[in-house]
Design a protein with these regions (language model features):
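Extracellular/periplasmic catalytic domains that process cell-envelope and extracellular macromolecules
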Residues: 16-20, 134-136, 464-467, 620-622
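Active-site-surrounding "flap" and adjacent substrate/cofactor-binding loops of secreted or lumenal enzymes
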Residues: 2-5, 18-22, 27-88
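Intrinsically disordered, low-complexity linker/terminal regions across diverse proteins
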Residues: 2, 52, 196, 255-258, ...
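Short secondary-structure subsegments characteristic of cysteine-rich extracellular domains
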Residues: 41-63, 186-206, 492-498, 615-620, ...
Length: 693
């Protein structure tokens, strides 16, 4: 009796025109990209999105079950779907906030009003987050970050290239002011909207760019209350916090979770100090009416889901169509699922795991992760550019990695979330914001819960958290093409194996390498090794700076100088993760073959190549070839041009084709797999290839 092995790839979908040596990404994904037409309600679609769509349908089934065990999620979802009630409520959701802004007679009163809005979600000039202190990662602390903008980032306010987007933004703001009856006519609305853009442009002038905010050292600025208060002397930090405390104390959430706001802010981490001092100067110089206008507009923009349909439609016209190229709003139930996932995802996620995640997948993943960690151990030990002292510290960090697979073992308690079936959507959202405020701020000063997940199990993604030194793989990503328990190992190591390797690699990328095995921001590198590492990463930055996504090269074919490039400095962390992930996953695949053959694992390149050569040939492809074909398939993606351009500005991930071809051309075994020659499109001279881990 013979057993047919499942290759885990789909050769019938590959290109008959382009070969892998010319363009690996187009060979695997080109026919699909050429054939697939994005639905009007999507600005992108691909392998990740297909799995997200599957999870979306599964969550809907749970939420619409009459006996839904996730009662809070069910109630929130139902209130969001009640469009008639939302439309009938008019401006009720924001009337109190608008009134509080209007009656402020001076800046001190406006500060008080903004603070009072915080518990239930109000406009933010200052961003607040709670997680581990990089200097003492076992304890949670407040992180203060730049905020206050409605466009994706500060570049949108200053670069000529974004002038059309700024014009559309002004148009959207004008329409929202009219929708809210805050402008008498089009002329007044347009004038106010232009003033609003001017105000935000002044705020944006103090923002750090996306490359600077990636610097873990520069963004770690422990600050006590006196220093923070001095930085925000004119904004009046005392008044802001006191009004926040007073407003919170009057809510039901305070009875469940009392908070001492002054104590919470005793010690904080400021990420961008010059933003705070710049914000303070802006606040001091700004006209009161301009500050009120900024606050009004952000109240509206932040509440469009809770307001009548014209607010939602106006919001979509800009954020959906103009910024992302999406032609049509997603149907209501899909947006409702996304909302529930964001507000109380573990509530419904617990049921999702029961119904859709087999325990056998978790066990298989544990084997994969074990081989990946073994492969990293070998790569670090055998590194030619890393000194012995740094190697030992890297190995110590690796030994402290904690993998988490599928779902949390410590589900969040939603008993304090006062979401009810008989409440309106705005009321339920207010309750959700109050719950989240109490939940997050109550963690300040307490020990970090390493069992807490930052993603729901129904999320198609994975992450590495440097202050906890954990790698996390939610249940929803553990499906084909990433993971197929019935496939031969090549496809799984090229798919989820590369993702696992990528996330472990974040522990040793330009950011993660600054944290030790306990999650502490700690310079554990020798100067020589750090210089070697920076030299390697600069080569990778230079490579990626040269890339222009094919679709944008075609869009700007008449004026190539205007075509936007990948930002190698912005994407370097993810690119290191990708490159490390592929190289390490290849070794791990060889180790898996060794286990099957009963051989001892040997990390030398000769042994790795010998093991890979013994992989079975399936569907006409060797194991080594199937590995790379599987890797390319997970990046199957199609974007609208607008979204592709936005991603180049703000996303630390490179475009899908660069994550495929840009990585493969740096991996020596790729050349062996497909007999790549100097005249082939994928060729990169050996001395230009970057080898890190």
């Amino acid at each position: 009796m013979s057993t047919t092995l499942n290759s885990g790839i789909d050769p019938a979908s590959f290109s008959a025109v382009t070969g892998p040596a010319q363009d690996l990404f187009r060979y695997v994904n080109g026919p699909w990209i050429d054939m697939y037409r994005l639905p009007d309600d999507r600005s992108r679609y691909g392998s990740f999105d297909k799995l997200a769509e599957d999870a979306e349908n599964q969550i809907r089934e749970i939420l619409e079950d009459d006996d839904c065990p996730a009662e809070k999620s069910h109630a929130l979802y139902a209130s969001f779907l009640d469009v008639d009630a939302i439309n009938a409520s008019g401006l009720a959701a924001i009337e109190d906030q608008l009134k509080a802004i209007d009656v402020a007679a001076d800046k001190a009163e406006l500060t008080r009003s903004l603070g009072a809005m915080n518990p239930a979600g109000g406009p933010d000039l200052i961003g607040i987050a709670v997680y581990g202190d990089p200097g003492a990662p076992e304890t949670n602390i407040i992180h203060i970050e730049q905020s206050g903008l409605g466009l994706p980032d500060e570049a949108y306010y200053r670069e000529d290239h974004y002038a059309p987007i700024r014009e559309a933004y002004v148009d959207m703001v004008a329409k929202q002011l009219k929708n809210a009856k805050l402008a008498a006519d089009d002329e007044q609305a347009e004038a106010q909207a232009q003033r609003f853009l001017d105000v935000e442009t002044r705020i944006a002038a103090n923002h750090w760019d996306n490359v600077a905010t990636r610097d873990s050292v520069k963004t770690y600025n422990p600050t006590d209350y006196a220093e923070l208060s001095g930085m925000l002397a004119d904004y009046d930090l005392d008044t802001w916090i006191e009004s926040w405390q007073s407003a919170y104390d009057q809510t039901s959430a305070a009875q469940v979770q009392p908070l001492d706001f002054r104590g919470i802010f005793n010690h904080v981490v400021v990420h961008e100090p010059s933003f705070l001092t710049g914000l303070n100067a802006f606040w001091k110089a700004a006209d009161l009416d301009d500050l009120k206008l900024w606050a009004r507009v952000h109240v509206i923009i932040g509440s469009t889901l809770e307001l009548p349909h014209e607010f939602d439609e106006t919001n979509f016209e800009f954020y959906g169509k103009t910024l992302s190229g999406q032609k049509q709003q997603r149907v209501r139930w899909k947006r409702g699922v996304s909302l529930v996932n964001g507000v109380c995802g573990e509530d419904v996620g617990r049921e999702y795991v029961k119904r859709h995640f087999p325990e056998s997948s978790k066990q298989r993943m544990e084997q994969l992760v074990g081989n990946l960690i073994d492969a990293y151990r070998v790569s670090i030990s055998n590194s030619a550019w890393l000194g012995e002292e740094t190697k030992q510290k890297a190995l110590e960090k690796l030994s402290k990695f904690v993998p988490k697979i599928g779902y949390t073992n410590h589900w969040r308690d939603y008993s304090a979330l006062d979401v009810r079936e008989n409440a309106g959507f705005a009321e339920n959202m207010r309750a959700a914001n109050l719950y989240e405020t109490g939940y997050q701020l109550a963690k300040v000063g307490k020990s970090v819960d390493k069992d807490e997940w930052l993603m729901n199990p129904q999320t198609v993604n994975a992450y590495y958290e440097p202050t906890m030194n954990v790698i996390v793989f939610p249940a929803a990503i553990l499906q084909p093409p990433f993971f197929d328990p019935n496939a031969e190992d090549a496809a799984n190591y090229g798919g989820i194996g590369a993702v696992i390797g990528h996330e472990i690699g974040h522990g040793f990328d330009d950011q993660g390498a600054q944290y030790d095995g306990d999650g502490k921001l700690n310079d554990w590198w020798t100067e020589e090794d750090k210089a070697n590492f920076e030299q390697l990463t600069q080569k990778l930055i230079d490579q990626y700076n040269a890339f222009v996504p094919t679709q944008l090269a075609e869009k700007y074919a008449d004026d190539p100088a205007q075509a936007p490039h990948v930002n190698g400095a912005l994407t370097i962390g993810e690119n290191i993760g990708d490159l490390s992930g592929v190289n390490i996953a290849l070794k791990a695949y060889a180790f898996a073959l060794d286990e099957v053959a009963g051989r001892e694992k040997n990390g030398s390149m000769e042994a790795i190549e010998a093991s890979l050569a013994e992989a079975p040939e399936i569907d006409g492809f060797t194991g080594l070839q199937r590995f790379f074909l599987s890797y390319a398939s997970i990046w199957r993606t199609k974007n609208r041009d607008e979204l592709a351009e936005q991603y180049l500005q703000i996303d630390p991930h490179s475009p899908a084709e660069c994550r495929t071809n840009g990585i493969a051309r740096n991996v020596d075994l790729f050349y062996k797999a497909f007999d790549v020659k100097p005249e082939d499109g994928m060729w990169l001279d050996p001395d230009q290839r970057v080898r890190i881990w």
